[in-house]
């Protein structure tokens, strides 16, 4: 959903005013000139939005805040199975900046647009299920995905997606790709930014979290001790707090 900068400024100021009044903390923000306060808020909006979008629960991301990657491209490369020698380059059937290549490791490489921030979902034809959370790009992951043995590396029953770099550009490595198969669905969260009309596209369910995170960063800049409370509220509204609690429990159990 598109939001005007003027509305965001107003909503952030409202959150700051309400919370300073309820907490009984002195008006650090109200002591600042209105224009100065708006300037500080403006500088923090996209940074706050980026933080929330990178760390939020994906179930809170709706279609109004995501972008589609092309779904009609086909993998037209020779998949040789057990050998590890790369082969084949794809010629996309449509004009696009997204290029796909495939090699003999049943891997498709999709170079990504400059505004790519976070994967929402990726799925290729023949996969039993889509991938929503990329595997961390580690040496172990690369070793498994790059194994010359077909039974070890990912396949269409257990696909894997790794975010990495290809020729200095961000790319998705989709393991479990088959010859002649294309992308059935692929969506990503773009880097949040304002357009020439001072509008910004944000997921509606995350709007309040972004407002609170912006307010928190603004108060931190102004030296108010209230910023931590608002930051905690932002994490609660976006599901980040829940994610951290689950991670902590898993760590305690040694998972």
Over which residues does each language-model region extend?
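Glycine-enriched, solvent-exposed interface loops adjoining structured elements
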Residues: 1-255
